[in-house]
Amino acid sequence: MAKYNAIEVFEKIGSKRVLPLFNYADIEVCKSVMRVCYAAGIRVFELTNRDSAAYDVFKKLVPFVEKELPELSLGAGTILDMETAQKFIDAGADFIIAPNLDAAVGKVCVDNYVPWIPGCFTPTEMKYAHDLGAEVIKLFPAGSVGPSYLKHIKGPLPFLKIIVTGGVELDELTISKWIDAGVFAIGIGSQLFSNQAILKQAYDLLEAKMKSIIQLTAKKEGN
């Protein structure tokens, strides 16, 4: 059962404008990355369902989060069908994220009162997702179109809350452009949590980089 409701989950995402997403078969690595994000001030985390170990890792992370990261909302990403959505919800997912728009997945989430963040690319998909109950939408792959695309979408659809993921660069100028375009949050995955950084166990460096990213979003928001 979800620990946090939609209002709380979206507040956690929007407060820092950052959503970390990660997947690794070694649960200890996942714990270390989650600790890094938590120490940097993040209170929401997406574990992506991108390999056969993801579900078992997720189930084991739920009690870890409750004990060691009590303010963290843990969600499941890369959820492609309603059966998988229900399975992760039953395991304790606070929210469900997908790279695509699937009405059946949305219905499972709505029926279980669990926030659903579907992946969309066109204004038509985004409006349809919103009508199906998605309060927040993921623009994916955002890096292939850039901030100007989001700005044009927000013009006629200003009520949409949009997270951008997929090839989003993390330099100050790019982050600034996304925020100016009206982004709700930026999804951060392999751009920060690279295999090289994980293999080197460079967790102090990852924490410092995450803090610097949060400072950029907070600085821009305050201007």
Task: Show the residue positions of the predicted features.
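Glycine-enriched alpha-helix->loop->beta-strand junction motifs that scaffold or abut catalytic
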Residues: G41-R43, I89-I96, D111-I117, D131-V136, ...
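Short acidic active-site motifs
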Residues: V29, V57, E83-T84, A104-V105, ...
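Short beta-strand/loop segments at the ligand-binding rim of alpha/beta enzyme cores
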Residues: S15-V18, V65-A76, D94, V108-I117, ...
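Conserved N-terminal beta1-alpha1 strand-loop-helix module at the mouth
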Residues: M1-L74, I79-E83, K87-A91, D180, ...
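Catalytic cores of alpha/beta
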Residues: D81-A91, T124-L132, E169-I186
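Catalytic beta/alpha-barrel core
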Residues: L21-N23, R43-S52, E71-L80, A93-L101, ...
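Glycine-rich beta-strand-to-loop/alpha-helix junction loops that act as flexible
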Residues: A76-G77, V164-V168, I186-S190
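Glycine-rich phosphate-binding active-site loops on the catalytic face of alpha/beta enzymes
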Residues: F95-V105, L139-G146, G182-Y203
